[in-house]
Amino acid sequence: MASGAGGVGGGGGGKIRTRRCHQGPIKPYQQGRQQHQGILSRVTESVKNIVPGWLQRYFNKNEDVCSCSTDTSEVPRWPENKEDHLVYADEESSNITDGRITPEPAVSNTEEPSTTSTASNYPDVLTRPSLHRSHLNFSMLESPALHCQPSTSSAFPIGSSGFSLVKEIKDSTSQHDDDNISTTSGFSSRASDKDITVSKNTSLPPLWSPEAERSHSLSQHTATSSKKPAFNLSAFGTLSPSLGNSSILKTSQLGDSPFYPGKTTYGGAAAAVRQSKLRNTPYQAPVRRQMKAKQLSAQSYGVTSSTARRILQSLEKMSSPLADAKRIPSIVSSPLNSPLDRSGIDITDFQAKREKVDSQYPPVQRLMTPKPVSIATNRSVYFKPSLTPSGEFRKTNQRIDNKCSTGYEKNMTPGQNREQRESGFSYPNFSLPAANGLSSGVGGGGGKMRRERTRFVASKPLEEEEMEVPVLPKISLPITSSSLPTFNFSSPEITTSSPSPINSSQALTNKVQMTSPSSTGSPMFKFSSPIVKSTEANVLPPSSIGFTFSVPVAKTAELSGSSSTLEPIISSSAHHVTTVNSTNCKKTPPEDCEGPFRPAEILKEGSVLDILKSPGFASPKIDSVAAQPTATSPVVYTRPAISSFSSSGIGFGESLKAGSSWQCDTCLLQNKVTDNKCIACQAAKLSPRDTAKQTGIETPNKSGKTTLSASGTGFGDKFKPVIGTWDCDTCLVQNKPEAIKCVACETPKPGTCVKRALTLTVVSESAETMTASSSSCTVTTGTLGFGDKFKRPIGSWECSVCCVSNNAEDNKCVSCMSEKPGSSVPASSSSTVPVSLPSGGSLGLEKFKKPEGSWDCELCLVQNKADSTKCLACESAKPGTKSGFKGFDTSSSSSNSAASSSFKFGVSSSSSGPSQTLTSTGNFKFGDQGGFKIGVSSDSGSINPMSEGFKFSKPIGDFKFGVSSESKPEEVKKDSKNDNFKFGLSSGLSNPVSLTPFQFGVSNLGQEEKKEELPKSSSAGFSFGTGVINSTPAPANTIVTSENKSSFNLGTIETKSASVAPFTCKTSEAKKEEMPATKGGFSFGNVEPASLPSASVFVLGRTEEKQQEPVTSTSLVFGKKADNEEPKCQPVFSFGNSEQTKDENSSKSTFSFSMTKPSEKESEQPAKATFAFGAQTSTTADQGAAKPVFSFLNNSSSSSSTPATSAGGGIFGSSTSSSNPPVATFVFGQSSNPVSSSAFGNTAESSTSQSLLFSQDSKLATTSSTGTAVTPFVFGPGASSNNTTTSGFGFGATTTSSSAGSSFVFGTGPSAPSASPAFGANQTPTFGQSQGASQPNPPGFGSISSSTALFPTGSQPAPPTFGTVSSSSQPPVFGQQPSQSAFGSGTTPNSSSAFQFGSSTTNFNFTNNSPSGVFTFGANSSTPAASAQPSGSGGFPFNQSPAAFTVGSNGKNVFSSSGTSFSGRKIKTAVRRRK
């Protein structure tokens, strides 16, 4: 019916399914049978959905009457179909088709015979062809339709088709579309069916006329099919052209199948016949009446015009996820599964379930359900029930199915059971398939039938399989070598000693016979134990060593005399000479026969290779034990083991290996006995002994005789190394016996010079074995055994240090030169080792041995000579020496230790003792505590001088990524050494300190008291982002006394007094007043805050905030900034060290790379920072004379108003901020609130221009800096002093002072309008800098004109330079967008940003919030309040304010927990101002 419906609705589709049903009618037939049974029941079921229960009952009666007749035929056919799915399905199909379609090409006959099935199904198909098509199987599953459907496309289509072809083609054609549509929707299909029914019924008033019945059945089927999942072609649009389908149907009434015209659906003509039967007028009449009832409901539905209905149906036909889902399952299950899957499962289950469901579901529910739920419900369950409704029909189907199934089951138990389940029980199943039934409905007729067949087939295969098992010949599982020996490839030596081959053969034959009497006759082919045994007996004894399958190991042990051990199998041949062998062979074979188990043991012991290797195969070898030709004969009799094969005693392999030929051990080629060399590889023919040795058979050793002659012994022997070959212990290369050194690594042959263990013994003895000494054989056993190859040579010892296995002669480990555990030789015996090694050649390993007394540096692991007291690489003191060497983690906390450490990479040596600043030079100490604290700000009090070096091992404050540790001053003092490489750690002291901008590691917030301590306590070597915030006044900073050298404290600010931070990347060392001279030898990021001028020197991530001195100038001290109030420190290009002598203001910072030495003493002449790379010279004194000569990023800020005091001579990145507002020199991650010099990522919030501190957000409390600070070439920082700040080539520095003339401030834009733009100065935005000042400056190279700092945080617009974005309306420079902030900073004012990494601006600002910002990594200069942002041009401020990766932005460290995004800067500013 599904196909019928499909056919009606979907025309072609339906037909196709009909064929499917034909193809797979088998199980679908079951469904169809149910359908046939339920022709009435199907109609009733359909009607149940549509028609009241009484109608259903009436139909059930009719169905029972008709169904009984029809169904009986159909049902039996179903069972038959189960047996013959196709046939039966076809019959069913034909019946249905005939009943429905063929007999009554006019709808009436087709339907009437189908009764409900045909009538309802077919009309359902017509009205609901789509449903049935989609439901093909379901329709079929529906009692009538199911039968039609059993031939998925046929039965259903037939019922539907026959009927619907006529009627539907006639009337339902258009309506058929509607039906199909309705079918798709299910309910609507019913409605359409009803309409159609109404139209049809009205047009076909005759109650039982096929049309009326068809309409009814159609509507029913529609309902049922809608309930049942079936392949509804209409769902896929095939049915939608119901006209097409109907036309197809019209073309041939028989071709009701939606897929093809004609009842070919199931059985072709048979289907037509069946339909005629099904199409009994009585059934049809009830169906029609039911249809009328449906029509009534349809009329109720019919309230909608047929046109509306069609539209609705069309819509329903349209694919919708829900409709498709409903249809698709049916399609998948039905069409696809119907032929095959359904055959067994769905159909049976469908029928069973259908029947059950039919009984379960009251007809009234059917009436109720059909309307809204009909499609889904029908498809899933109801449809089936509708089909099944007639109990009689179901019963009939069950009966027939059961009968057929029973017959089937009897014939085919599995299939029968399944089918019975499917057919009889399958009804319940069928209900389940109901859901599946959609699928199964589609394939219902065909698919189910097929399934049954399939199942039957499956059952048969099972039986067949069972049959197969018995058929298998019984073979003794222990396939002994005797059986195999028939094909024994490795009995080459059989003929080796021909003397008793015959005897052995006979013996073997006897053995074989004895073993298995029949085996003699066919032992060759039988792998029966006897053959194997005989072979084994013969073969194994000769090569008892590895070849005995029973107990290879034992045999191996028996090597020389083990033949006895092998005796049961091997012993006869092994023990006995040929004659003995014959006798023994006989005896033994019986044993073997008795003990096929024996062979089993052998087999158990080894694999086929073992068998092949076993003496049985290489019996000649085994016989070699007998040394006499007899030994060969054992080989022969081994063949006899195959005895029927080789009465001659030569096995298949033997014939090849017979004494007439010998196998080359090198290339395994068979050579004639006359050949002395291998014809292929020219390898010399090995004597039997050699062969035996090669074979590894120990028996050969027994008889240095013919036994050895088994050159061609076992098959496995071919693969065995030549006797005497030895494996190099070093490179595992196999060497020839004559080689005394490894051909690969030239390692001496084991045992040559040494009491090498078995290996040598084996080899040498193997050579000796030629003599056939049994003892030597034993030795060889070590070589021979497979596991022995992996055994350590005797006396070998494993180095306890490096676990390398050493030869017995080695007194030291050849690898690590460690002494042999038992040897008394001291470590110095390395010389001894070479001595011993020479014997072995030791591969020249002596060359790699450590010289005596050499020692490895603990820090860098470099090997140093014994006379070296320091590591050549890192100059670390030799362990045990009291040199100044600081361990990787050790930081010299002694005051003397404070001495400068020359380029201590990560080591920051902070010594409380002020006097010895330079005393201990930690040469590039990697692991010194103070070294390389990326984000650590050391907030420890002065108590703990230990600089926090890049301490790998020290746990204190170890590398806390995002932790901000807030410790109180006392604790801080103690904890000074805690901060080790704390990435994001901000150690907050009790004093609230402004968050340090992107302190790579830590921002130290300390109270004033603590500040003092902090300077002492925290010399964070390379504290990347550490900012030391000292609430205390200058004194804390003043604590210069303790010279705190934080080597390369990248981000650390060393608060410790007098600590010199050589290349302390960022540590700022606050030196006590006592020791003004802090040497920041290239303190990379170290900022030493002087109390007033606390200049945070490019503290990479660290911000040092001192509340007292807003003056804090943070020069981008690449490494360390010494903030001494005394200006005396002159870094004279002291690359890593900047010495500040308290007495002398003139402390020269000779090119202190990043170190800024602010001298607090005003009286003293200003420290001259000679090219203090990153140093910022901040002088409190008016003198401010401290001129950082080319202090790279140093911001020289002099607290005194003296405008010119601090000449930042070429301060690379520093911006000079004169007057109190501290210039924040490029403290990398630091933001100096008081000074607006913008650190790298910082935005200067104060009006004062920020020197281009990388990330620093410098918030200048005081914008006006009276003294004109000359910032010579401040790389990144901008001079922030309002007074004319001359920035000499301030690279990124922005000269903030109006008067400031910035000379070539590379990236800096002078903030002060008056400042004539230096090269990179603000006026013309320098390379990356944008002028912080509002006055526009010609864009510097890469700078952003007017406050936009290219690198610095957002600054105000400056004429855009190459890459800069002018914050103002200025046209964007090359890559810049006009209002972009400096490189890392985002300037709030400008919305456009050119590739600002962190800026919020659209330009690829990673984190920066400010819309504008050129390539501002994280800086966000979005805070309007901070005038510094616009004014201060931060050169390359990665993250100014925005928390997003603000390296130094805001005092908030992005990494440091404390850093907050935008507000952070403001907060910092406030905090610093507070301080």
From Swiss-Prot:
Keywords: Acetylation, DNA-binding, Glycoprotein, Host-virus interaction, Isopeptide bond, Membrane, Metal-binding, mRNA transport, Nuclear pore complex, Nucleus, Phosphoprotein, Protein transport, Repeat, Translocation, Transport, Ubl conjugation, Viral penetration into host nucleus, Virus entry into host cell, Zinc, Zinc-finger. Zn(2+) 1 binds at C664, C667, C678, C681. Zn(2+) 3 binds at C799, C802, C813, C816. GO terms for biological process: amyloid fibril formation; mRNA transport; negative regulation of RNA export from nucleus; nuclear pore complex assembly; nucleocytoplasmic transport; protein import into nucleus; RNA export from nucleus; symbiont entry into host cell. Zn(2+) 2 binds at C728, C731, C742, C745. Its cofactor is Zn(2+). Its main location: nucleus. Residues 107-121, 181-190, 1321-1335, 1343-1356, 1363-1396, 1420-1431, 1438-1463 have a biased composition (Polar residues). Residues 1350-1475 are annotated as: (Microbial infection) Interacts with HIV-1 capsid protein p24 (CA). Gene3D superfamilies: Zinc finger, RanBP2-type. Sequence repeats lie at residues 236-237, 652-653, 715-716, 786-787, 905-906, 926-927, 961-962, 983-984, 1000-1001, 1024-1025, 1084-1085, 1118-1119, 1135-1136, 1173-1174, 1212-1213, 1228-1229, 1240-1241, 1275-1276, 1289-1290, 1291-1292, 1306-1307, 1319-1320, 1327-1328, 1341-1342, 1362-1363, 1374-1375, 1383-1384, 1397-1398, 1417-1418. Binds at least 4 zinc ions per subunit. The keyword Repeat applies. InterPro entries: Nucleoporin, Nup153_N, Retro-transposon_transp_CS, Znf_RanBP2, Znf_RanBP2_sf. Belongs to the NUP153 family. Component of the nuclear pore complex (NPC), a complex required for the trafficking across the nuclear envelope. Functions as a scaffolding element in the nuclear phase of the NPC essential for normal nucleocytoplasmic transport of proteins and mRNAs. Involved in the quality control and retention of unspliced mRNAs in the nucleus; in association with TPR, regulates the nuclear export of unspliced mRNA species bearing constitutive transport element (CTE) in a NXF1- and KHDRBS1-independent manner. Mediates TPR anchoring to the nuclear membrane at NPC. (Microbial infection) Interacts with HIV-1 caspid protein P24 and thereby promotes the integration of the virus in the nucleus of non-dividing cells (in vitro). This is Nuclear pore complex protein Nup153. It comes from Homo sapiens (Human).
